[in-house]
Design a protein with these regions (language model features):
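Conserved beta-strand-loop-alpha-helix junction that forms the acyl-donor binding cleft
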Residues: 116-126, 143-148
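Conserved GNAT acetyl-CoA-binding A-motif
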Residues: 106-117
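Conserved beta-strand in the GNAT
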Residues: 62, 68-79, 84
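A short helix-loop-beta-strand connector motif used in the catalytic cores of GNAT acetyltransferases and
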Residues: 46-62, 79
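A short, internal acetyl-CoA/4′-phosphopantetheine-binding micro-motif in the GNAT/acyltransferase core
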Residues: 64, 83-91, 118-119
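Conserved acetyl-CoA pyrophosphate-binding loop and the N-cap/start of the following alpha-helix
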Residues: 89, 93-101
Length: 183
C-alpha cells in the first residue's frame, strides 16, 4: 500500500484536481446526481480548478500514495471548500490525512471557526465530518447543480478537530480506520 504523503498543489495540477473530483463525485453522488439524468459538468469544473490554483486565496493540498495523486482538499480563509478522494482509497486514510492537514491550515489563519458545506443526502461524508468534530450549525442552501439538493453548513471550532501529528507523511492506517469523501 505504501505511505501517504501530502503536498501543496502546483500551478499545473488543474487536470489532476479535475480527474480526482470527477472520479470521486461520480462514485459518491450516484444516487444524488444520477449520471443518466445529470451529466458531470466537465467544462465548468476544469475552469473551477484552474481558477482555484491561480486565485491566491485558495490553498490546495494533494494526497499521493506511491507518487500517484489519490485525493485533494481546498481551503480558503475560514472554509474547508472541498475534500475529494478516489474511491479506491476510501477507507485507507487519505481523506483523514487531507482533513487533518486542512484543519492545520485553517487553524493558522485568523478564523476561530471553520465551515464547510456538505450535501444532506451524503450520509457517508456527514459521518466523516461529525467523527472529526464538525457539527451542523443550521445553515441551509441548495446546490447550484440540478436537481439542486440541500446542502448543510457544518462548523468546527478550530483547535477541537482531530488532527494528525505534525508532518506531512502519514503511515498506512489500520484496516478499521474510516475514511470518507467530502459531500
Amino acid at each position: 500500500m505504501g505511505a501517504l504523503s501530502i503536498r501543496a498543489a502546483g500551478p499545473n495540477d488543474d487536470e489532476t484536481l479535475f480527474a480526482i473530483h470527477r472520479e470521486s463525485a461520480m462514485a459518491a453522488y450516484v444516487e444524488i446526481f444520477p449520471p443518466d439524468r445529470y451529466r458531470f459538468p466537465d467544462a465548468e469544473m476544469r475552469e473551477v480548478w484552474a481558477l482555484a490554483l491561480r486565485d491566491g486565496k485558495t490553498s490546495v493540498l494533494i494526497a499521493e500514495r506511491a507518487g500517484s495523486p489519490v485525493g485533494f482538499a481546498t481551503v480558503s480563509p475560514g472554509w474547508l471548500r472541498n475534500l475529494f478522494v478516489v474511491p479506491t482509497e476510501w477507507g485507507r486514510g487519505a481523506g483523514a490525512a487531507l482533513h487533518d492537514e486542512a484543519v492545520v491550515l485553517l487553524g493558522s489563519g485568523d478564523a476561530s471557526i471553520a465551515q464547510l458545506w456538505v450535501l444532506e443526502e451524503n450520509e457517508r461524508a456527514r459521518r466523516f465530518y461529525e467523527t472529526r468534530g464538525w457539527r451542523d450549525d443550521g445553515g441551509r442552501s441548495r446546490s447550484g447543480f440540478p436537481p439542486h439538493p440541500v446542502e448543510l453548513r457544518y462548523a468546527l471550532r478550530l483547535g477541537e478537530g482531530r488532527r494528525a501529528p505534525p508532518g506531512r507523511t502519514h503511515p498506512e492506517p489500520p484496516p478499521t480506520q474510516g475514511d470518507e469523501l467530502r459531500g
